[in-house]
Amino acid sequence: MNFSKNLPLLVSLWAITFFAYTHAATFDIVNQCTYTVWAAASPGGGRRLDQGQSWNINVAPGTTQARIWGRTNCNFDANGRGQCETGDCNGLLECQGYGRPPNTLAEFALNQPNNLDFVDISNVDGFNIPLEFSPTTNVCRRLVCNAPIVQQCPSELRTPGGCNNPCTVFNTNEYCCTNGPGSCGPTPLSRFFKERCPDAYSYPQDDPTSLFTCPAGTNYRVVFCP
């Protein structure tokens, strides 16, 4: 290789890699529902979004086990304390942890091996709001879970404002995969979710059809009621 001739290319490649690993990813969170959604993010906090409003958060590279979700039928006081019917996070407007099921999740891990982000929509914590999770440019797949799951929810999974995942209700290995890899598989109740939202996790070990990748450095859009 002629090093001097290829130096500009090498510098450009280094700059792209450096940017992906050192710059936060931006998440544009949008409420297109006809009702108010109290958006939540871990990390990130939380904010009330009326119809048509949006909220931008920046997430540091290398962040893992992160999620964004919506809360419904909330009531907070001037100090940001209260409660929500679904997705509540310890009674706080600005969440400091995960939400209480049921809640539809946009999950992600940024800047993982091979310069990839791992992204998914999950119904493992149940379903409360239709959700889209997509890149802001066409660099990877658009994920959507937009079925009338609350209205069609099986009776044993129904709860005010949402539809529980069977793991939440029964808390057994059959539904929660608590005995480790390969210890559980699809069930009739998990298939209820999968048939309506093929892109989304329906049980904890649903990785082959539910976990997707995007290039590190991608920015994202999360839409309630796409």
Curated annotation (Swiss-Prot):
InterPro entries, sorted: Osmotin/thaumatin-like_sf, Thaumatin, Thaumatin_CS
- Tissue expression pattern: Expressed in fruits.
Q: Which domain of life is it from?
A: Eukaryota
Q: What is its main location?
A: secreted
Report a single Gene Ontology molecular function. Answer: hydrolase activity
Biological process terms from the Gene Ontology for this record are: defense response
Endpoints of the signal sequence: 1-24
Give the subcellular location: Secreted
State the GO CC annotations. Answer: extracellular region
Which key words tag this protein in UniProt? Allergen, Disulfide bond, Hydrolase, Pathogenesis-related protein, Plant defense, Secreted, Signal
Please list the disulfide bridges.
Answer: C33-C225, C74-C84, C89-C95, C140-C214, C145-C197, C153-C163, C167-C176, C177-C184
- UniProt EC number: 3.2.1.-
Q: What does this protein do?
A: 3D-structure modeling suggests it may have endo-(1,3)-beta-glucanase activity.
UniProt lists the family membership as follows: Belongs to the thaumatin family.
Listed name of the protein: Thaumatin-like protein
